[in-house]
C-alpha cells in the first residue's frame, strides 16, 4: 500500500463535506518515514474514513481537522509501527461516553440533542476492524474542545522504501 495514495483518496472523498462546512483540513506526513507498507488497503481506508468523517460531522462550521501520520520502531526487522492521528476542535465527548465509544449503538446524549444523525455503530465497527488488523485504537477528548483518535498498526515494510528527503 502506498500511503500517499490512500491519503489522496481520503482527501478527495471528504473534501465536499469539509468545503461545505468551511473547515480547515490538514494532512501532515512530516513524520512518516516509509511511504509503502504491507496492509489491507480497504480496511485501512475504511478505518480512517470513518474517523475523519466523524471529525467533519462533529466539528462545527469553520472548525479544524488535522490528520497526522508518524512512525516508531517496533523492534522487529522489516516492520514499523505506523501511527495515524485524527484530531479536531469539535464538540468533544464526556469522559463517561469515551468509556463506551467503541460499544455498538452507543451515542453521546449531546449528539442526539443536537440532531446529529447516526446509528452508533461506526466506531464499534472501526474498533473491530483495527482489532482484526492487530492494531490499537485510542481516544482522547474534552467536551467543547475536541477529540483525537489514534490508530496504531504494526506494518511490514514494502520493499524497504523510505520517504524521499525534501530539499532544504
Give the location of each predicted region.
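Glycine-rich G1-box
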Residues: 16, 91-92
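Short helix N-cap motif at coil->helix boundaries in the Bergerat
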Residues: 3, 92-100
Amino acid at each position: 500500500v502506498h500511503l500517499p495514495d490512500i491519503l489522496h483518496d481520503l482527501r478527495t472523498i471528504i473534501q465536499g463535506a469539509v468545503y461545505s462546512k468551511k473547515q480547515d483540513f490538514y494532512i501532515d506526513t512530516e513524520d512518516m518515514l516509509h511511504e509503502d507498507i504491507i496492509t489491507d488497503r480497504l480496511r485501512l481506508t475504511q478505518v480512517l474514513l470513518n474517523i475523519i468523517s466523524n471529525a467533519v460531522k462533529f466539528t462545527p462550521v469553520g472548525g479544524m481537522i488535522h490528520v497526522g501520520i508518524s512512525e516508531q520502531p517496533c523492534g522487529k526487522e522489516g516492520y514499523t509501527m505506523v501511527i495515524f492521528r485524527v484530531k479536531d476542535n469539535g464538540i468533544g465527548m464526556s469522559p463517561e461516553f469515551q468509556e463506551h465509544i467503541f460499544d455498538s449503538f452507543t451515542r453521546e446524549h449531546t449528539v442526539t440533542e443536537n440532531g446529529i444523525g447516526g446509528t452508533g455503530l461506526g466506531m464499534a465497527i472501526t474498533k473491530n476492524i483495527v482489532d482484526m488488523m492487530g492494531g490499537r485504537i485510542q481516544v482522547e477528548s474534552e467536551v467543547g474542545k475536541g477529540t483525537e483518535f489514534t490508530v496504531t498498526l504494526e506494518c511490514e515494510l514494502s520493499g524497504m522504501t523510505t520517504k524521499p528527503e525534501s530539499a532544504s
